[in-house]
Amino acid sequence: MTTILKHLPVGQRIGIAFSGGLDTSAALLWMRQKGAVPYAYTANLGQPDEDDYDEIPRRAMEYGAENARLIDCRKQLVAEGIAAIQCGAFHNTTAGVTYFNTTPLGRAVTGTMLVAAMKEDGVNIWGDGSTYKGNDIERFYRYGLLTNAELKIYKPWLDTDFIDELGGRQEMSEFMSQAGFGYKMSAEKAYSTDSNILGATHEAKDLEFLNSSVKIVNPIMGVKFWDENVKVPAEEVTIRFERGHPVALNGKTFTDDIELMLEANRIGGRHGLGMSDQIENRIIEAKSRGIYEAPGMALLHIAYERLLTGIHNEDTIEQYHANGRQLGRFLYQGRWFDSQALMLRDSSQRWIASAITGEVTLELRRGNDYSIMNTVSDNLTYKPERLTMEKGDSVFSPDDRIGQLTMRNLDITDTREKLFNYAETGLLSSSASTGLPQVGQLQDKTEK
């Protein structure tokens, strides 16, 4: 039997990821009217633009849901966000400005926790609002089936009957009004927004055009730092980690990770920290563009990597970055819980994050403009006395360095011979216009 149902399974229970917006409201009502038995599941992800979560299940019941549940996903989402920071699981960057994979993290948590709740209710068919051109349709597909092997997928937006009747937002609004709910469309924005406690994604519509800049976006987690009329005074903030876990901000210790992330968002948001404009490759290899906010994630990430560079050696840091980029891709593709991702994640958390204990002080200014003011840790391998230029006791002498340099003669000789070989085969030019060594000429002189 096929996993994806193209038409409404009449008479059967269908779980719908219900946001309370026009799309899912119309879909739920339509499914009930057509004879299905819809169950509504709403994820509380700590969305900064959601005012009343309790109202959402009540509306679902009004629209015909057999049952409606609100699932608090915030604790798990923050835990996954901190894990991503510990592993550096971020692969999309532009000129050093990072996208913190906040939407993929949200999908990993939503896709597993909502389907687990559905399974408890005996609901084995799942629908959500993802479209066939995006990443989420595959992410939810993977996470849903990982959680419930018996799961079937029904998406109204892939059902031609639904599309023919309610193919646009205007038709959906009229459908709701005719049913007596008087649903009014919200004011149309120049882009769409998806958010959770870790960050916000702004994309589509006007933002599909690269000549539309960040300036058309109204941030929901921070300030318009690019607007000269917005006052953004500099601010010092101290972040403390213990064994890779953020525990304190500005001297205040948090026992609740949700509250810590909210406070990190408030601090970073006051400066517009963590906002980025990215061109990325979707799972299907087509490029898309998004503008992202993640003030708390950015704040914690900066402090974490500052401690990382002061504590671990070069090879470990290099492996952290390489594994982090690969893990970020797995996360983006909906493979956060696949074995290849768990392997990378476990190694970074076990051998890298466990040593990250200390405190970093930053001065935040506008946007991603900041300075590192101080770094303190008992685990630092940074020892200024080892390389001081001042006179005094040293851990090694000039004679030690002469010996070390002499040992380099071995690989320098090997490299010179390779360069001669490259010149002989024409791979290296002896032209004066190149920046390469004139090895051909050097070889001639050596032979003479």
Curated annotation (Swiss-Prot):
Pfam families: Arginosuc_syn_C, Arginosuc_synth. It is found in: Cytoplasm. L-aspartate binds at residues 131, 135-136. InterPro entries: Arg_succ_synth_type2_subfam, Arginosuc_syn_C, Arginosuc_syn_N, Arginosuc_synth, Arginosuc_synth_CS, Arginosuc_synth_type_1_subfam, AS_cat/multimer_dom_body, AS_multimer_C_tail. One of its GO terms (cellular component) is cytoplasm. Keywords: Amino-acid biosynthesis, Arginine biosynthesis, ATP-binding, Cytoplasm, Ligase, Nucleotide-binding. The keyword Nucleotide-binding applies. It is an enzyme of class 6 (ligase). GO terms for biological process: argininosuccinate metabolic process; L-arginine biosynthetic process; urea cycle. Signal peptide: none annotated. Its main location: cytoplasm. The keyword rRNA processing does not apply. One of its GO terms (molecular function) is argininosuccinate synthase activity. PANTHER family: ARGININOSUCCINATE SYNTHASE. Belongs to the argininosuccinate synthase family. Type 2 subfamily. Homotetramer. This is Argininosuccinate synthase.
